[in-house]
Amino acid sequence: MTIVVGACRRCQNRAMSPTPRPGPTAFVLAGGGTKGSFEVGVLQYLVGVEGIAPDIVTATSAGAIAATVLAQARTLPEFAQRVDEIEGDVLAWTQTEHVFGKQAWLGALEGTALGREIHNEITEGTRPPFPLSPTGALAGSEAVPPASAGRRERRQARRTRRKRQRHMLRLAAGAGFRLPRVRRHLRTSGSSVLNLEPLADALRHGTGDGVRPIDPALIRRPGLQLRLAVTALRAGVLRFVTEDGTIVESDARTPAPGAAAGPVDLVDGAIASASVPMVFPPRSMADDDYVDGGVIEIVPVRAAADLGATRIFAVVAVPLTLARDERDYAAAPAGYIGLRSMGMIGVAERQIANLNASLPEGVTLTTIDPVVDVVGLFEVQPGLLRINKDYGWLRAADVLAEGDAAIAADMVDGTHAIVEARREAWRLEESLWAAGPADGSAAGTLALVREQKELVRELVDRRKQLGFAVPDGCEAWWTGYEAHTTGRPGGLPVSPSS
C-alpha cells in the first residue's frame, strides 16, 4: 500500500500501511516557471530544518534547474549549501538578462515601445489576479471585468480593450521600419519568443553576481540518482536525462534510441526540461528535439518510485486546486482564455494525475503544494519571488507538523492569510512607488500597508504561541517593505511601521 501524507486535497484516498519499509528518499521537484521560487522555501525547510537529504531527485522544467544544482551534493551540509545556491539563483532571475534572451525577431524590435510591450506581457501578463477590490473589480484586470459586473462596468471594460488595441496598433506603426527585418528573422527563429541561452551560459560559466555554474563531475559521482523530465517532439514520448547525461525512456532506466551516441550535456538536459513550448525553442539532443517535460509529466513521482524510492517528497509549484477566477471569459481576449485553460487548468489536472500514479506498496508520498497563487509563470518581481519562497518554507512546516489536527488546520489557514496579506502589502507598496509620496492618496495607501503589516505580525505571533515553526528573520515581513525593482522613493518613511 501507499501512504499519503500532506495536503493533496483532490488526490484519491489510499489505504495506510503502518510500517513503510526503510529505503531511499526522493525529492520530486515540479515545473512552474518562476513559481518554482516556492520550491526553494520547501527545500530550505526539508534540508535545513528537518535534516532530510535525498538519494534520488526527479524534476521537470524549473524544478530541473534546481535539481541540477542540488544534485552536486552528497552530504547534508553539502545539500544545505546547494539549497542556498538555488535561492541565490532564483533571486538572480530578477536580472532578466541572466535568464532570458530575446529571439532574433524580438531582438529586431529592441528599443521600440512594441518590443518592450511584448516582453512585459510575457513577464508580467501571467501574474495571478489580486482579490476583488472594495468596488468589486479585479485589481489590475480592468480589461476583463468580473462575470458579475453590471452594464456600466462592461462598457468600461470594452472601452479599455479598444484603447489597448489602438495602443498596440500605434506601437506596431511606430516600429514599422523594423518590420521587414522582423519578418526575415521570423523565418528562422519564429518558433518562440524568448530563449534560455543566458541561463545556459550562466549554468556553465556563472555570472559573477547571480547564477552560479554547475560542475557535471560532481553530479556524476555515485550516491545520487538524477532524472530530468523532457518531452521528445519527434518520438512524442516522455524521456529523462540522467546524472551522467544518458537519455532514458519513461521507465527512468531503459536507454532511449540515440543514447548509444554518448551522454548529452547536463546543462542542455536541464534547459530542455525548462523549455516551455512556444515561449522557448526546442533543444536538440541526440536524435530528437526536446521541450519541457511538463507537457507530459509535471510531477515525476512515478520515476522516483521506479528508481527505488520508498519515501517521496513531491514539491509542487502550481496550486492543485485553482481559485475561482471571476473574470468574464465570454468577453475576454484569447490570451486570457488560453492562459486559463491550458496554462492553469490543464497544468493543475496533469499534476493531480501525476500525484495519483500507482505506486508500489510501502512507498510514502508527501505532497507539499501551494494553495495561494503568488507569482506569474515568468514573473521576476523580487518581492513576489521572496514572498513565494517564504510561503514554501511555511507550507512545508505545516505539512510535516505533528500534533492536534484542528490546531494544524488553523495554522494552515494562518499561513495562507500571511501570504495573502504580504502580497496585498506588496501591491499597495507598488502603487506608492509609482505615485510617489507627494501624491494625495499616499498617506491613505501607507495606512493600508501598515494594516497589512500588523495583520502579518499578529498571524506570526499566533503561530509561534501555538508552537509552530517560523523562519529566521520573519520580523522583516512587518517591520520593512517588501522588495521592489526600484529603491524606496525619497519622502517615504524608512519603515512602514515608523
Labelled PLM ranges:
Residues 1-5:
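Extreme N-terminal basic, low-complexity initiation segments
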Residues 8-60, 69-498:
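Patatin-like phospholipase
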Residues 66:
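Catalytic DNA-binding helix-loop module of base-excision-repair DNA glycosylases/AP lyases
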